[in-house]
Amino acid sequence: MKSEKETIYDYAAELKLLAFKEELECTLSLAAEENWNHLQFLTELLGKESARRRECRRRSRIRSAGFPQMKYLHELVMEDMPKEAQVILPELETLDFIRQGRNLVLYGNPGTGKTHIATALGIKACQQDFTVLFTSVPVLLTQIREAKSAKTLRTLQLRFEKYDLVICDEFGYVSCDKEGGELLFNHLSLRAGKKATIITTNLAFNRWNEIIKDKVLVAAMVDRLTHKAYLVNMTELSYRLKETQKMRQDK
């Protein structure tokens, strides 16, 4: 016949209470030492289970977001960042722009930390229970075209709309025709004024017509994406180049 403890382990396994199962012995000992009553014991044990599940959800959100690599805000060397980024980053770190459904556009030279900032904000958002999608504009446009061909575009749109934060990296690396520009504009417009989107681009707004050959569409896209948005000019000496120079000096 099973002991009460073994029975508890079985119930915990059946109910997928992993922390409950792992922490039972330790919590029983602590309860005996502290002379806890039953409610105190259960509160402690269920608190550990709740903490474990929150951590699992955070890891799952980060994994599902699709970040190409892990980047964190504390890794940024603030004095090496462009001036505008230094000023606005403390406000962005609060993630209020996500709660307010405001966009963030990081534009400027390659290697200045745009993707690092976007990724780091996305990871912090996942850690604070926001749902996040990281994608590049070329990949997103391919997905939109494929969904349209497969007649599943509305399904893709509904999923895209629901994320608390979408990060669209590398806007401007690949040009697109008028149809592609319209598809991208319509897709991004689904979130306008409701959910936050981060755009990283190496092109200033007056050069967007180099990748989308329709001036009217470009004007509409700029207007839609920048309305009440944070616009951060990252045009400065490459952040990556500065890191390389420092490494050489340290040798």
Question: Which positions does each model-derived feature cover?
Answer:
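Short hinge/gating elements
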Residues: 10, 26-30, 75, 104, ...
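Interdomain "pre-motor" coupling segment immediately N-terminal to P-loop NTPase/helicase cores
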Residues: 9, 13, 18-68
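Short, Asp-centered acidic motifs that coordinate Mg2+ and/or phosphate
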Residues: 165
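Conserved P-loop
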Residues: 57, 86-162, 211
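N-terminal pre-Walker A segment at the start of P-loop NTPase domains
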Residues: 71-95
